[in-house]
UniProtKB/Swiss-Prot annotation:
It comes from Mycoplasma mycoides subsp. mycoides SC (strain CCUG 32753 / NCTC 10114 / PG1). GO terms for molecular function: mRNA binding; structural constituent of ribosome. This is Large ribosomal subunit protein bL12. Keywords: Ribonucleoprotein, Ribosomal protein. The keyword Ribosomal protein applies. The lineage of its organism: Bacteria, Bacillati, Mycoplasmatota, Mollicutes, Mycoplasmataceae.
């Protein structure tokens, strides 16, 4: 009767680290393969260097033109005047909008900065 996967795994669990290392080397030699972690690990690193597909528009300070900033926040978020005022009067930093395309976020940032606010894109 052939050995099952579960039996192999159980045997591996009982082995010491140096024994596992020797086993990997023996498998590499026997089958002519290389167990390389570096190749598999390189792919996610490339993905993290890609430009983000969504960002958040975060206001770090209101500036001197509070009324102008409230109007822009109202326009950008679609909330009422009182809700926009609550957002602007809230504790900084405050997220104005999440999950925004980078191009749209840049436009929003430009409008808010023009109104006097300080903005970060995260």
């Amino acid at each position: 009767m052939p050995i099952t996967k579960d039996e192999i795994i159980k045997a591996l669990e009982e082995m010491k680290l140096n024994e596992l290392n020797e086993l990997v080397k023996a498998i590499e030699d026997h089958f002519g393969v290389v167990a390389s972690v570096g190749v598999a690990a390189a792919a996610p690193a490339e993905a993290t260097n890609a430009a983000p597909t969504e960002v958040s528009v975060v206001m770090t300070s209101v500036g001197q033109q509070k009324v102008a900033v409230i109007k822009v926040v109202k326009e950008l978020t679609g909330v009422g005047l009182m809700d926009a005022k609550k957002i602007v009067d809230g504790t900084m930093p405050v997220t104005i909008k999440e999950h925004v395309k980078p191009e749209e976020a840049e436009e929003m940032k430009a409008k808010l900065v023009e109104a006097g606010a300080s903005i970060d894109l995260k």
